[in-house]
Amino acid sequence: MEGHVKRPMNAFMVWSRGERHKLAQQNPSMQNTEISKQLGCRWKSLTEAEKRPFFQEAQRLKILHREKYPNYKYQPHRRAKVSQRSGILQPAVASTKLYNLLQWDRNPHAITYRQDWSRAAHLYSKNQQSFYWQPVDIPTGHLQQQQQQQQQQQFHNHHQQQQQFYDHHQQQQQQQQQQQQFHDHHQQKQQFHDHHQQQQQFHDHHHHHQEQQFHDHHQQQQQFHDHQQQQQQQQQQQFHDHHQQKQQFHDHHHHQQQQQFHDHQQQQQQFHDHQQQQHQFHDHPQQKQQFHDHPQQQQQFHDHHHQQQQKQQFHDHHQQKQQFHDHHQQKQQFHDHHQQQQQFHDHHQQQQQQQQQQQQQFHDQQLTYLLTADITGWKGIKHCTGPDPEPF
């Protein structure tokens, strides 16, 4: 027919172009009907992944056909008229009718066999033509009507078989698509579940790590606090000892002063007594005479007085030496105490610096964890989210 626009090929027709030629070359004696059956079985055995390129090619051909023929509309041929002469379908009309009856589905992803069954219908029409146009005697009208009914019944049965085969194949394809969708949906759920478990494990591990760091940091702070308390106690004890030493030194010095004052009073008392004795000696000539008469006593008294003075000087010198020694010890203790305070101050500054560094590290780790958790969560959401599969 001139001006007739063919419909675009579906996925099976795209696939069967090369396969039909190969099968015909391998089996030259095989009929076209048998070739179509084998091609249908082979197409049915292919997986969805193997069929996907042919579905894509069929979709591309459909788009090109729509662009080339924008006003195209499928219009099936009308039902063929019965010949007035013989009462049977003409061969070309029968072939066209069979082709039109086999136009099942317009979905580009559905498996149809229009081209193959049109060829089979054409072969069928040629066989019928060779049969109907043989020179035989014209039977009676009843016999012709019976033959026509048989032919129509055979054609109807053949069409029903093809329709059943197509329906069965459509059901199998729908079941496969549903199984594939269910499998993909199950895989997506499993991936999302695995990703969620990984995030939970990462979060638990990081939380445990943070708790351990916090516990260690708390222990370090407690140790630092205990160390400070110990140092404070030591300082207090040293201060108390120093105060006791000062008190002892003060008591000792006070005692020495009292002792010196007492000795001085004794010396004054002795000197006063000695003066009184001299006055008495001057006032009593008899005693003076006795004193002159006894020069040895005077010498003894003078020697005794000199010994007393030497003893007093030695005692004073010894006390001065003792005071100097005590003063030197106090200076040494004060110097040692000052060094201990300086060491404690330096140690305290070092601990404060370490604590600040630990706090800064802990803050940086928290910031890194928050950034990592945000990026990982965003990637997980982007990876897991997507269109939900169609319901079965």
Curated annotation (Swiss-Prot):
Its main location: nucleus. It holds the Pfam family HMG_box. Residues 182-197, 210-228, 239-250, 261-295, 313-349 have a biased composition (Basic and acidic residues). One of its GO terms (cellular component) is cytoplasm. Residues 52-84 are annotated as: Sufficient for interaction with EP300. SMART domains: HMG. Residues 92-144 are annotated as: Necessary for interaction with ZNF208 isoform KRAB-O. GO terms for biological process: cell differentiation; male gonad development; male sex determination; negative regulation of gene expression; negative regulation of transcription by RNA polymerase II; positive regulation of gene expression; positive regulation of male gonad development; sex determination. Keywords: Acetylation, Activator, ADP-ribosylation, Calmodulin-binding, Cytoplasm, Differentiation, DNA-binding, Nucleus, Repressor, Sexual differentiation, Transcription, Transcription regulation. It comes from the Eukaryota. Phosphorylated on serine residues by PKA. Phosphorylation by PKA enhances its DNA-binding activity and stimulates transcription repression. Acetylation of Lys-81 contributes to its nuclear localization and enhances its interaction with KPNB1. It is found in: Nucleus speckle; Cytoplasm; Nucleus. Residues 94-138 are annotated as: Necessary for interaction with SLC9A3R2 and nuclear accumulation of SLC9A3R2. PROSITE patterns: HMG_BOX_2. The modification N6-acetyllysine is found at residue 81. Residues 6-22, 75-81 are annotated as: Required for nuclear localization. Residues 144-181, 229-238, 350-361 have a biased composition (Low complexity). The keyword Cytoplasm applies. SUPFAM superfamilies: HMG-box. CDD domains: HMG-box_SoxA_SoxB_SoxG (cd22028). Transcriptional regulator that controls a genetic switch in male development. It is necessary and sufficient for initiating male sex determination by directing the development of supporting cell precursors (pre-Sertoli cells) as Sertoli rather than granulosa cells. Involved in different aspects of gene regulation including promoter activation or repression. Binds to the DNA consensus sequence 5'-[AT]AACAA[AT]-3'. SRY HMG box recognizes DNA by partial intercalation in the minor groove and promotes DNA bending. Also involved in pre-mRNA splicing. Interacts with KPNB1, ZNF208 isoform KRAB-O, PARP1 and SLC9A3R2. The interaction with KPNB1 is sensitive to dissociation by Ran in the GTP-bound form. Interaction with PARP1 impaired its DNA-binding activity. Interacts with CALM, EP300, HDAC3 and WT1. The interaction with EP300 modulates its DNA-binding activity. Belongs to the SRY family. PANTHER family: SEX-DETERMINING REGION Y PROTEIN, SOX TRANSCRIPTION FACTOR. This is Sex-determining region Y protein. It comes from Mus musculus (Mouse).
